[in-house]
Amino acid sequence: MTDEIPNPVQPEKSLKRPLDGEQLEEAHPPQPILPEDSAVTKAEKVERNGANGNSVSNEEPVAKRIKTEEQNHNSTATDSRDRVRGIAPIKAEYLLHPAGSRSATDGRNPAANDDAAEEKPRGDNRDNGGKKKKKEKGQNKDRQFGSWGDKIKLCNSTSNSPEFSPKECSFGESCKCEHDLRKYLAEGKRGDLTTFNSKCPVWEDNGTCLAGWKCRFVGSHSKEVKREDGRMELVLIEDLERMRTTVAGDEEALGGVVNVVSTKDKLDLARRRTKMEKSDLYTNWLDKNSEEVNRQSNLRKDQKNDQTQEEKEENRARYVEPPFLPSEKRRIYFGPETPVLAPLTTQGNLPFRRLCVELGAQLTYSEMAMSIPLFQGQKSEWALMKAHESEITPPRINPDRSSIVQNYNNSKDLKFGTQISANKPFQAIKAAEILSRFVPHLRVIDLNCGCPIELVYRQGAGSALLDAPSKLEKMIRGMNAVSGEVPITAKIRMGTMTGKPTALKTIERLAFGGVESRERLGAPGCAAITLHGRSRQQRYTKNADWSYIAECAALVKSYNQKKDDLTDTIMEPDARTLPNAPDGKLHFIGNGDCYSHVDYLDHIQNASVDSVMVARGALIKPWLFEEIEKGQTLDKSASERLQYIEKFARYGLEAWGSDEMGVGQTRRFLLEWLSFAHRYVPAGILEHLPPSLQDRPPAYRGRNDLETLLASDNYMDWMKICEMFLGPAHEGFKFQPKHKSNSYEIEAEG
């Protein structure tokens, strides 16, 4: 199976799994490779897991580094009230062990290893003592993970049709699926779920259910009717008044889902029938222009000085203008009233974003998509572009703010943007063109320049772009040229190496362009920059450096003045080369460790950022956006938190379907979310506020049994929570938490 998974960054290079070496403690256990995984997720899993499912690393385990740092942190107190750094200050009556006892220290929950959620560096031949790896044979050599589905597969020609009038099966007599509906219902699928009052959430919302007879709630929208000949026929029920009109005839658009790309468009991309004239023209010009720039830069200084005026004029004449200028962009706005939900791999799925928008998130991003699979038409990558209709509504703004962009029209703005990754300019440029063409509801296209994942970094994408500023500028400039009215933004880190920040230079380049291109081409056109206050090397260890973010914010604030200084006094810059023209405002967003409204306000006021992007804080408590809006800490009860989990389950069934596959998919992503959400410590049992994202609690009990259950770090308890809304797991279902070396495998029923 792994041989069929392409490299999403560089297709010409095959993915290699690490060799079997010494058995190590797993920091990130094997994850199942599923068809619906995005390209980068599939590739990560291939490179991360050994032949026997064992991770191999040539670096010191991240968990060990974290433990060492915590020991150093815990040795000092942060205030006069003996608040110990790194330990959540829980009131004494809720502690399971007396304060100061050894049990109190031993009973602390283990540190959540957020680095384990990222890929571990792969090993090499030395990890296996130089021995040649024995190649496994057979098509099922990687079938070590769980799966879920119906025992008997019902043919699609029957799945949504009345019993006596199915559609014509395109496979005819050679079809291997079941066509006997009653046999399928009796033997092929599990019984109906009794959750959600035994009513199908999809049918309740749309008046129809796309899963048809495969639905785990099919009894709520089907009946048996008597025909004239006396036979009893099974039929599906539809509520015509509640049925929604699908977009472009695509059934996937039900349930308030937008940005659904048609199967025809994806097939045209896969078969290279889609023309990308703008991208081809621009990349051809870019290649020729780069050759001339390289030729000039390779001249020795004395050669340049010896050039005659005529030779200099001839060199200038060799430069060819770009084939076209960018279109003027839609104005966008970031402000204190627009907190941003970060692009979250795996966790940033549509149901979770929908929940966050409901709780006050004003701007959202898709999960990071790889550029090559996008313009190759891969279904799993285009699925990341789907958004809920609540994400295409305008963000909430304060119209009285003096910093608001000139000519900004809030009614034309929306919340949802997408993020892509690429390691070559042509990849990013092509992806930007097809996204602006096929995705109608798109606020921005963000280029990821901060992803620390080893697979992405090693091949020149993600945070590796921070060490290739010229290439990064070409990407932004090219994307800006072909994206129509959709603005281009970038998300960066402080740098790749700890103690050697490069973000100031990167920001200056994104704002003005490099010295070699600034005079001829103007600004690259980056509309906004988000800075994560850590280096790639730090990953998620140590606190985000907001003092450095503030230093970068000061540079961005001087952007307009410096832009005027660099502008020729005779010629005004072309508005099409500037973000948010006519004033050319560059927005700046900070990112890192925001976990309360106090953190948010502090960063806005003291770091002088336009807005703050929230990541792990929102995963642990998605009502953080509500706290920011109200300006207070909210002590959510256990029942309220359970309602959010129920909403996620409902939204998941609406997004992924209510059949066995959809229920399993919803269960999987709900468990992924609970692996973060269980870290929340209720505000009402803390001695000190605001809470810190880096604090971990000692062993404690909640104010009631449900609160204690929600705080459990045992994945079996997470399974119990899921079963409240999704019923018992399929016998083949497995779950392996990202942050722990354990897994769940349900015992066979009966």
From Swiss-Prot:
UniProt cofactor(s): FMN
UniProt-annotated catalytic positions: 451 (proton donor)
What are the record keywords, sorted?
Cytoplasm, Flavoprotein, FMN, Metal-binding, mRNA processing, NAD, NADP, Nucleus, Oxidoreductase, Repeat, tRNA processing, Zinc, Zinc-finger
A cellular component annotation (GO) from this entry? nuclear periphery
GO biological process terms held by the UniProt record: mRNA processing
Q: Which InterPro entries match?
A: Aldolase_TIM, DUS-like_FMN-bd, tRNA_hU_synthase_CS
List where in the cell it is found.
Answer: Cytoplasm; Nucleus
Under the heading Pfam families, the entry gives:
Dus
Does the keyword section mention Signal? no
EC id: 1.3.1.89, 1.3.1.-
| Chain spans, region Disordered | 1-145, 292-318
Q: Where does FMN bind?
A: 343-345, 419, 491, 532, 591-593, 615-616
Q: Which reaction does it catalyse?
A: 5,6-dihydrouridine(47) in tRNA + NAD(+) = uridine(47) in tRNA + NADH + H(+); 5,6-dihydrouridine(47) in tRNA + NADP(+) = uridine(47) in tRNA + NADPH + H(+); a 5,6-dihydrouridine in mRNA + NAD(+) = a uridine in mRNA + NADH + H(+); a 5,6-dihydrouridine in mRNA + NADP(+) = a uridine in mRNA + NADPH + H(+)
- Compositionally biased region (Basic and acidic residues): 13-28, 61-72, 118-130
UniProt-recorded Gene Ontology molecular function terms: flavin adenine dinucleotide binding; mRNA dihydrouridine synthase activity; tRNA dihydrouridine synthase activity; tRNA-dihydrouridine47 synthase activity; zinc ion binding
Zn finger intervals (C3H1-type): 155-179, 200-221
Describe its function. Answer: Catalyzes the synthesis of dihydrouridine, a modified base found in the D-loop of most tRNAs. Specifically modifies U47 in cytoplasmic tRNAs. Catalyzes the synthesis of dihydrouridine in some mRNAs, thereby affecting their translation.
The record's PANTHER family line, in alphabetical order, gives:
TRNA-DIHYDROURIDINE(47) SYNTHASE [NAD(P)(+)]-LIKE
Tell me its family: Belongs to the Dus family. Dus3 subfamily.
User: Which protein are we looking at?
Assistant: tRNA-dihydrouridine(47) synthase [NAD(P)(+)]
Organism equals Sclerotinia sclerotiorum (strain ATCC 18683 / 1980 / Ss-1) (White mold)
The top of its lineage is:
Eukaryota, Fungi, Dikarya, Ascomycota, Pezizomycotina
Q: Which gene encodes it?
A: dus3
